[in-house]
Amino acid sequence: SGAPDVAQGEYYAVPQYAIKGNLLDITDKTSGYKDFYTPGPWASVQFAGKVYGLPMDSGPMAFFYNKEVFDKAGVDAEQIKTWDQYYDAAKKIHALGDNYYITSDTGDAGFFDSMTWLAGAKPFQTSSDGSEVTVNLTEDKGVKTFTDFWQKLLDEGLLDTKTAGWSEDWFKGMVDGTIASLFTGAWIPANLANSAADGAGKWRVTQMPTAD
């Protein structure tokens, strides 16, 4: 067929290829490796109870923040444990100036998925054989929990909605503090080091706040 015997891909693609029969079931060859991995990455290479690959890495989300800006606003990011506390912090940071925001909303679909999952959402369901897919974005409790929270921040003008993600201006915001924090994967420090080097020493990381 011209396809490689072994290929690297993102976890989300495993079901897409497995449903079509494009991946080889290697369950019998990998059962001994289960305890080597944490549950999340191990589950990510499975579909319908079968294993189709081995995890290579994991990018757990974390709360990255500009300590200099948070200190200026009188906010201790380490004490932000809930989304309500994050909302309160957003108001204090925006009070520093009209161009200061706790974070930006770039419209990233992956961010939406991650945050709704954090709230316990399961809006996408598949049948055991993968032949049927159910999408429930309007009634899922976790989706509503996140969208209500995020919409409140948007309605009150507490998020930067004008700066495109991964743009030069976006990284500039990381440097000058006008974009003061990120909920993102643990891989972001390398990006900050390369594209926002002038902000070195200002950024810290802590655990993600949750809905309650």
Please place each PLM-identified region on the residue numbering.
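Extracytoplasmic "Venus flytrap"/periplasmic binding protein-like
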Residues: 1-37, 72-74, 81, 172-173, ...
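Beta->alpha turn/N-cap motifs
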Residues: 9-13, 167, 184-189, 208
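Hinge/lid segment of periplasmic solute-binding proteins
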Residues: 10-61, 87, 115-117, 202
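Extracytoplasmic/periplasmic substrate-recognition and gating elements
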Residues: 73, 148, 152-159, 195-212
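Hydrophobic residues within well-ordered alpha-helices
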Residues: 86, 93, 116-117, 172-177
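Glycine-centered hinge/linker elements that transmit conformational signals in sensory
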Residues: 88-92, 132-163
